[in-house]
Each structure stands twice: as C-alpha cells, then as structure tokens.
Amino acid sequence: GGIYDSAEYDKAIAWAREHLTIGENRNLPANTRTQEEYDRQFEYSIKMVLVARDLMEGNPRLAELGYVEEAGGHNAIAAGFQGQRQWTDCRPNGDIMEPLLNTTFDWNGKRQEVVFATEGDACNGLSMLFNSVLTNRPQLFSDVRTYWSPEAVERVTGHQLEGRAAKGFIDLRNSGATTLNATGQERDADGNPVIKPWWEITEEEIEADLRATTFHAANAEYFPGGGFSTHFVTAGGMPVTASRLNFVAGLGPVLQVSEGWTIELPDEVRDTIESRTDPLWPTTFFVPRLTGQGAHASVYDWMANWGANHTATGYGHFGADLITLASMLRIPVYMHNVPPERIMRPKAWIPFGTADLESADFRACAAFEQLRTVAGDQHVVTRAAVQFVAAAVLACREQFGAVFAKVAEERRAVEVHQAAVGRDVNAVAGQYVVAVAAVVLRNGTRFVQCLRCAVV
C-alpha cells in the first residue's frame, strides 16, 4: 500500500540494497529486532524518500496511477520532517530519507540536492536553503552537540590538540539530515577534500561517498519505532560556513553566521569522542574562526552564543554573501566573524551607525521594514519583496559572480539529467533563484514553500 510509484520504488530499493552498506547494530539484545523486521524497515525507509520527494515536487506518474491531487505536489523548494516523537515512537525514523534527499545523487544518478530539515526545524531549513541557493552545494544539518576543550580532550584521550583545533572544537552530530556529500571524499584539482556542486561530482566520487558511509539500526532508546541512522566521518581541512536563522518575538528573524573549518582527529581519539554521544551518527568536528572578542572570542563563546542546538553548515567561506542577502531581506545579522573588508551592505545603512555595525543592522532593518507580510503566525514573503531582492542581486553580479559563472554549465547539466530520468526535477535550470520561504504545516510535516524569481 501507499501512494508512490512502485516501478521507481523497485529501482530505488535495488540500488539501495546494492550501494548502502549496513553497519553494526549496537542495540541491546532486548531491543534488537529480527532480520525480517529490519528488512521491512529498510524498505519502508526507501519508500519514505519517494513519498517526501513527491510531496515536495509532485510526480506525474502518480496521476497515471489515479492519484491526481497527490501528483501535483506542493512546489516546495525545501521541506522538513518532525519525526520525534509522534512518528518515531511507532514508525521508522527519517534518517535514510533525510540524508538521501540532501545528497546530490540517488538511484537516478547525480541530481540537485533537495533541501530537507529534520526535527521539523523550519529555521534551520531556511538556513540550509539560504546556504544552498548561494553556493549550489548540499548542506549539513547538525546538532551543536558538544564543545570539547583542549583540557577535556587530553583528560579523556591523552591527546593534545594542535593546529586549528588547538583551542578546542565543536562536535556537530545529528542522526539524520546531513548530506552524504559531507564525507569529504570529493576532491578538487589539488586533491583537497571538498563538497562539490551536483553537476561536478563524478561517478567515482559518488562511489567514494557511499563507501565512506554506513547505515545502522537506529538506537531503540531514541527511536522506539526503529529505522536506521547514518554514520560517516567528515574529512578535515574543509573551509565551511555555519549559519542559523532564529526568530525573536516582536522582532522577527535574525541571523548568525560563522566561518571556520572542519578538523580531523586520530582514529582512537575520535572513537572516544564519538562514544560520548552516539558513534553511529555522522561525525563532523568544526572550529570557528576566532576573532578574540565577542561571540568569537573562543570556541566556547561561539557555542554559548549560538541561538539553538542546530546549525546549517555548507562548504566554503560565504559568510559575506549571507550578510549581503540578509541586508536585502532586512534580516539583522547579530553574530558573525566575517572580516569587514569582505562585507557589502547597502550604502543606505551608513546613517544608522558606522562604529557598531551589528547594532546598526537592527536599526536599518527596522527602518526599512522586513520584506514580508504576516499571515497568522506564518511569515509570508510578498512577490514584490522577492522581485526587489532579485533586482538587488542583479546589481551585485560581482558579489555573486561565482554563481552566475555556472549558469550555462548548470543549464546543460539539468537538460541532460531531465533527459536521463524522464521527469522534471524542478531544478534551477540555469536560473539563479533567490528564495525566501513561508512555513506551511501539512500532515504533521513542515513544508517550506516559496515564491521564486529567476534573474538571468
């Protein structure tokens, strides 16, 4: 039963059985299920991928099967899944669905990632969306799990941190929703670990990402309904940017931005750190760029000032682009570590202050008013607002030059992909899309829908 394309499911489950490696099961004997039950849960999890994608994008095949309404989808550019606890207490979790949607390949080959947040966190979903449309790269959804100080690491492992990790690091760890591209198995021309735009990834890199990932029976103490969790270790040395959109009553959305790097630890040290939480979840160690003052005075200060236990993290140092985008949307940025010479805000910001620019951001955004209307408890972006942002991005082609340089190549890649899979994947297709979203609740799942404006 269920509303999905059974023919595509057959293709998907065959691919999953061949390419997804099932790792060890660490459940206690009393919580361990039979192999037949794990097989059924694996099949159910793959069906969840199809259903979530079709809910977002639609699928004309469903109309042929008699499900005309469901075939339309919601034209969602991003989405999320609450899961805990109403769903996961009695059904398999979303920890296969979420990372596969966020990854730039599946049984149909390479494709654009589908922005998908876990735990119904619309704010982190929006952060992932902003990161995605600015970089054209898939994102990590992570818990800000733990700050590990140099003293704590040495006490529990005997290892002395050095290099970028010398002042400590953040353990970013969540059981699902982190893209499999974050393994760091993709490489640039110099052999450095990267997360590539989807059209650049090779078949060899897809295989390497999959080899570096294992799927494990979910911890029944967290997920009584079962399912699977994803594990890999993110390669060190990658420049990354963490962001977080928070909502403040009476103020609205506010943004945090932090550039930094991933780091690696010796295997035995990493194993000890992983065992303090859950060793079967994705492992990413993050060090923010420290400034010696404010929220970036130390790694601990970064964690203490972060607005939630979730963060959206993407490849590259693109904090300046996020700050510029936030100014267009009238979203104040109240914490960042981007060097001032890289930041471009509208000149109209100057009369609101030149010394304390974070405070000036709040005054300017209040004066110019945030570009949205309010419908009930939902923040809805107006078409005029999106058109304004699109025009502003056009005026800032130099700032966003790297994105525009990929337009022609991306269009060709999308056309090839559409021809290969025989369906519209609702990809960017040569358009730079500025997307701002409103949260819509449907069937217990948070869908982030948006108006779009293409500007090429």
Residue ranges and their predicted role:
Residues 1-5:
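Generic multipass alpha-helical transmembrane bundles of integral membrane proteins
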Residues 6-35, 45-368:
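Anaerobic metallocofactor- and corrinoid-dependent redox/one-carbon enzyme cores
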Residues 369-456:
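Charged, low-complexity amphipathic helices and coil/IDR segments
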